[in-house]
């Protein structure tokens, strides 16, 4: 697409203008480069400017016809400049005067002559570790003195505060004061947000404090003992009030109301030693809560369940059991048929845990000792003895057995059944296995060796795959 050239009536081509059709493209490239690069001083004179002015009218037609090529060249130049990432306008070398380097002679540069070193093992060891030797003219450079180190904020504030109080000098405004002044000009929402941020920062920076026996002059152990003693008195009074209400036919609700407080106190880990202390004897009040009332009725199921669970977490010893008497109540729950099965199992578990250290028994079943007895085959009745004993039975016994057999539900007669007994065996027969020598391999040793070899192969295969990767 070529646009018609627009000329002013005053512009006329010069008569003596030489033909420049061949060099139009070169001049266009030169003009594009001159548009990007700044002019070099001293490169041309007034004659060159005059020649350019004379050549402009004659070149107008060609330039207008080739505007498309020029735009394409300029776009390509811009892409090249973008790729290079360094324009001539921002370059430092664009401001350098080239005229001052006209008389530069590289042969006359003063370079220090140094003797050439031979390359050997000793010189190679010095590479990267030696220091440049200074000449006498350079002298020794003075080492920079280290400036005054900045103090930490906390020590600086303490020192400034102490010096101000002693000398009465002017205090320097801190950043906190500036922030307070700035916050006065803020809106309420921003102030609330900043206050919340400060509170969260203080909570995160606050170190965790270790629990001490004394805090602000108050003995924490003495305070815990006083709290437990007060709870013991209240529990005893509640048990007495429930017994009175039960005799009068009123509902007994005092122990149920106090149950959450009692369970909360028994579950506090920091009071464990005080809870099982025989002198305070809190477990005696727990016994009053668990024992049956005067009419033989058991306490509420919630009281039994929660207190049994809490007792299982306490380290109760022999002295505590003797002082409190709670072991008698637990034995009653194990032998009575009225408690729920779950409560009964909990009582049996407590009784086993409390009596094991007293009887010096271990809770490890592998170390449990069983009574052993030898098997005597002479006590087994022979068929002849069985016939004699069967004749001795009375007729009434045989009739009763026949009637009981007839009343049984129908079943297959040819089916082998194992008798279910509700008893447990306390005597263990002595083993009759032949004792082998200690050097003999036990049964199943070959299978273990085979499994061990397979495992070793798997491990080796996995390591080989990991090394290949």
UniProtKB/Swiss-Prot annotation:
Q: Which GO terms describe its cellular component?
A: nucleus
* UniProt KW Transcription regulation keyword: yes
Q: Which parts of this chain are annotated as the region Disordered? A: 1-193, 444-469
Among InterPro entries, the record links this protein to: RNAPII_TF_IWS1, TFIIS/LEDGF_dom_sf, TFIIS_N
What Pfam families has UniProt attached to this entry?
Med26 (PF08711)
Q: Ranges of Low complexity compositional bias?
A: 66-78
Q: What does this protein do?
A: Transcription factor involved in RNA polymerase II transcription regulation. May function in both SPT15/TBP post-recruitment and recruitment steps of transcription.
Where along the chain is composition biased (Basic residues)?
Answer: 142-153
Organism of provenance? Emericella nidulans (strain FGSC A4 / ATCC 38163 / CBS 112.46 / NRRL 194 / M139) (Aspergillus nidulans)
* Compartments it resides in: Nucleus
Extract the PANTHER family matched here.
PROTEIN IWS1 HOMOLOG
Name the chain's protein.
Transcription factor iws1
Task: Using the record's annotation, list all stretches that form the TFIIS N-terminal domain.
Answer: 284-361
| Similarity field | Belongs to the IWS1 family.
Q: Which GO terms describe its biological process?
A: poly(A)+ mRNA export from nucleus
> Which residue intervals are annotated with compositional bias (Acidic residues) in the record?
22-34, 79-110
Q: What is its main location?
A: nucleus
Q: Give the record's keywords alphabetically.
A: Nucleus, Transcription, Transcription regulation
């Amino acid at each position: 697409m070529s646009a018609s050239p627009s000329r002013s009536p005053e512009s006329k081509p010069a008569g003596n203008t030489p033909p420049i059709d061949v060099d139009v493209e070169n001049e266009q490239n030169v003009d594009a480069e001159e548009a990007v690069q700044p002019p070099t001083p001293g490169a041309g004179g007034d004659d060159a400017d005059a020649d350019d002015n004379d050549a402009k009218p004659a070149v107008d037609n060609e330039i207008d016809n080739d505007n498309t090529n020029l735009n394409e060249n300029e776009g390509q130049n811009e892409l090249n400049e973008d790729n290079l990432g360094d324009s001539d306008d921002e370059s430092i070398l664009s401001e350098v005067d080239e005229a001052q380097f006209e008389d530069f002679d590289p042969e006359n540069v003063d370079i220090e002559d140094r003797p050439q070193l031979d390359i050997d093992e000793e010189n190679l060891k010095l590479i990267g570790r030696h220091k440049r030797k200074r000449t006498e003219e350079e002298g020794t450079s003075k080492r920079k003195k280290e400036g005054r180190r900045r103090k930490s904020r906390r020590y600086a504030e303490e020192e400034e505060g102490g010096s101000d109080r002693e000398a009465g000098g002017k205090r320097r405004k801190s950043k906190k004061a500036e922030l307070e002044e700035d916050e006065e000009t803020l809106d309420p929402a921003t102030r609330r947000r900043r206050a919340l941020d400060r509170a969260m920062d203080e909570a995160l920076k606050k170190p965790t404090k270790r629990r001490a026996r004394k805090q602000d002059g108050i003995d924490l152990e003495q305070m815990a003992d006083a709290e437990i003693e007060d709870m013991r008195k209240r529990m005893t009074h509640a048990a007495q009030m429930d017994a009175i209400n039960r005799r009068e036919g009123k509902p007994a609700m005092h122990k149920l109301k106090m149950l959450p407080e009692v369970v909360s106190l028994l579950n506090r880990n920091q009071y464990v030693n005080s809870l099982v202390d025989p002198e305070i004897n809190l477990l005696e009040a727990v016994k009053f809560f668990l024992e049956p009332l005067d009419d033989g009725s058991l306490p509420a199921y919630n009281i039994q369940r929660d207190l049994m669970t809490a007792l299982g977490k306490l380290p109760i010893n022999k002295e505590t059991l003797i002082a409190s008497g709670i072991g008698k109540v637990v034995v009653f729950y194990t032998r009575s048929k009225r408690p729920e099965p779950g409560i009964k199992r909990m009582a049996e578990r407590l009784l086993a845990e409390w009596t094991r250290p007293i009887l010096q028994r271990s809770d490890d079943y592998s170390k449990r000792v069983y009574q052993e007895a030898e098997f005597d085959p002479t006590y087994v009745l022979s068929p002849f003895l069985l016939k004699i004993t069967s004749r001795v039975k009375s007729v009434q016994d045989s009739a009763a057995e026949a009637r009981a057999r007839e009343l049984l539900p129908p079943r297959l007669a040819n089916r082998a059944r194992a008798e279910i007994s509700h008893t447990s065996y306390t005597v263990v027969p002595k083993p009759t296995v032949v004792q082998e020598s200690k050097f003999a391999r036990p049964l199943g040793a070959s299978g273990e060796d085979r499994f061990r070899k397979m495992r070793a192969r798997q491990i080796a295969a996995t390591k080989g795959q990991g090394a290949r990767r």
